[in-house]
Swiss-Prot record:
The record marks H34, T133 as: Transition state stabilizer. Belongs to the IspF family. Homotrimer. Binds 1 divalent metal cation per subunit. One of its GO terms (biological process) is isopentenyl diphosphate biosynthetic process, methylerythritol 4-phosphate pathway. InterPro entries: MECDP_synthase, MECDP_synthase_CS, MECDP_synthase_sf. Involved in the biosynthesis of isopentenyl diphosphate (IPP) and dimethylallyl diphosphate (DMAPP), two major building blocks of isoprenoid compounds. Catalyzes the conversion of 4-diphosphocytidyl-2-C-methyl-D-erythritol 2-phosphate (CDP-ME2P) to 2-C-methyl-D-erythritol 2,4-cyclodiphosphate (ME-CPP) with a corresponding release of cytidine 5-monophosphate (CMP). This is 2-C-methyl-D-erythritol 2,4-cyclodiphosphate synthase. The keyword Glycoprotein does not apply. SUPFAM superfamilies: IpsF-like (SSF69765).
Length: 159
């Protein structure tokens, strides 16, 4: 078994909506990013890549490459997952924590879980997504951006 951890943060800027966990969420602010700014899928992709010792999302999909300008993070997650499976790994489970004062994530979490399970080809019971605030402390509490942490457990697939 191998464990990976991922973290991502994006500042608010411009106009919404935002995309978190593959879900388009209405909000008056957007997120500043080279790709679609999906902090949840970026953190999750990093956790999976880390568990497989494949580096990180910036190595695989550099923000200096115009190919990835405005990229759909679900596509990036699926490509990373293909590479991980090619190394002989299967998914144990993933756990994602979104850290944001606003907008409220709770109504969108069920669809996030559906999208992540689809992209990883796993059962929804293997995917957990939760959200928390920082009680108005720090940059997320001041409404300056959104952060996310994720962990992933990979299992070496039997041959």
């Amino acid at each position: 078994m191998r464990i990976g951890h991922g973290f991502d943060v994006h500042a608010f800027g411009g106009e919404g909506p935002i995309i978190i966990g593959g879900v388009r969420i209405p909000y008056e602010k957007g997120l500043l990013a080279h790709s679609d700014g999906d902090v949840a899928l970026h953190a999750l992709t990093d956790a999976l890549l880390g568990a497989a010792a494949l580096g990180d999302i910036g190595k695989l999909f550099p923000d200096t490459d115009p190919t990835f300008k405005g990229a759909d993070s679900r596509e990036l997650l699926r490509e990373a997952w293909r590479r991980i499976q090619a190394k002989g790994y299967a998914l144990g489970n993933v756990d994602v924590t979104i850290i944001a004062q606003a907008p409220r994530m709770l109504p969108h979490i069920p669809q996030m879980r559906v999208f992540i399970a689809e992209d990883l080809g796993c059962h929804m019971d293997d995917v957990n997504v939760k959200a928390t605030t920082t009680e108005k402390l720090g940059f997320t509490g001041r409404g300056e951006g959104i952060a996310c942490e994720a962990v992933a457990l990979l299992i070496k697939a039997t041959k």
